[in-house]
Amino acid sequence: MSGNTPHILVTGGAGFIGSHLVERLLADGKSVVVLDDLSTGSRDNLRGVKAHPKLRLVEGKISACSELEELVASAEGVFHLAAAVGVDLVVKSPIHVLETNLHETEVLLQAAAQHGVPTIVASTSEVYGKSEKPAFSEADDLLIGPPQHSRWGYACSKLMDEFLALAYAQERQLPVVIVRLFNTVGPRQTGRYGMVLPRFIAAAKQNEPLRVFGDGGQSRCFCYVLDTVEALVRLQNSPAARGQIFNIGNTEEITIAGLAQCVIEQLGSKSVVEFVPYAEAYAPGFDDMRRRKPVVAKLERVTEFRPQTSLAEIIRRTAENI
């Protein structure tokens, strides 16, 4: 497939979420170009479709891609998923995280705006910061922690991506949609960068201790990756979504200690739960969010869809692939 064939461009398309999105787009009959530097993604994530005649993989950074202008100009739509992610990476490599999430997004938005290509920009629930609201909606005020704690650099970088995207929408009429993803999980997610569910499942399958950081009372809502993909596709196909921000997440809430116990029970594991102080797991002064539950009424209103795959089913499907 040549670069000027009409296609959907997916940055980060060899990553966890991106690879599932690519499979869905191909199944829908779309031609797809993946632009990925494979820093966190991998060719293996695309092994099921690597020989597909409507798929092309371009390896490299967005900012270093000599074909970027052509790839964007001939695109029918762009999904910008490329980013530096994961708590471990954020804490250990803050410069890399900030540079990647800010610069690569700006380059992509410039190209998309020049050609007026409908674009979805993936943000994160991390932008809600330290707010203690029981559930977060898109219009809420955001409370970010201090810059001395590198964890908040990731949230700020993604929030700046949102500001950039909306600025391009306002000044250059870019048809853009921002999505705040809440703990997307499922097959192909790796625990290498601190992702909790694959880490728990891998340990439970070996009957090893499940290490819970802090007191385990922090709660999260876990969204199955195919539910996230369904929401992304529906938003891209909805002109009413453009210029807006949407939460994408499941509303079934569980503490991390509860998640560990649920994994043990679902897999019939002999593992035990082991609590580890944040200072031992990360750096002294590490901050965390106590709750992170989305309000998805806006998503449901615009797309007539809300993620509903149960946590038990998510654990089962994910465990089959680890």
Q: Where are each of the predicted segments found?
A:
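N-terminal Rossmann-like NAD(P)+-binding domain of SDR-like oxidoreductases, especially those catalyzing
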Residues: 1-182
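A short C-terminal helix-loop "cap" of Rossmann-like NAD(P)-dependent dehydrogenase/epimerase domains
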Residues: 53, 138-145, 173, 200-212, ...
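Hydrophobic "lid"/C-terminal helical patch
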Residues: 21, 232-236, 260-263, 315-322
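C-terminal "lid/loop" region of Rossmann-like NAD(P)-dependent oxidoreductases
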Residues: 215, 245-246, 257-260, 268-291
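Amphipathic terminal alpha-helices
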Residues: 6-7, 297-298, 310-322
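Residue-level signal for the nucleotide or nucleotide-sugar donor/cofactor binding architecture
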Residues: 41, 63, 92, 100-103, ...
